[in-house]
Curated annotation (Swiss-Prot):
It comes from the Viruses. It comes from Spiroplasma virus SpV1-C74. This is Uncharacterized protein ORF7. Keywords: Host membrane, Membrane, Transmembrane, Transmembrane helix. It is found in: Host membrane. The chain crosses the membrane at residues 50-70. Belongs to the plectrovirus ORF7 family.
Length: 83
């Protein structure tokens, strides 16, 4: 177990670091895009099953879910403004 942590720490410390801010930001956006794409694929795959399971209730719940997502994103936008 300790060996795994030491290997991870060593790999992290010896990994090539970005030379410029642009390279660092590119890496961040690439990772974020990849994560969001996986979320989109997951939602796309499970969406039909959710609609069948909920029946007619999805007509009300989906706009509510979108509303909640917008509120959460606005919260993060406000939090990031503080930095």
């Amino acid at each position: 177990m300790l060996g795994m942590y030491l290997t991870t720490a060593f790999n992290f410390l010896t990994a090539p670091t970005p030379k410029t801010m642009t390279e660092g930001m590119t890496g961040i956006w690439t990772g974020l895009t990849s994560a969001l794409w996986k979320v989109k694929e997951g939602i796309t795959n499970i969406f039909p099953e959710i609609m069948v399971f909920l029946g007619e209730a999805w007509i009300i719940l989906i706009p509510f879910a979108i509303f909640c997502i917008i509120k959460i994103l606005n919260f993060f936008r406000v939090m990031v403004k503080g930095f």
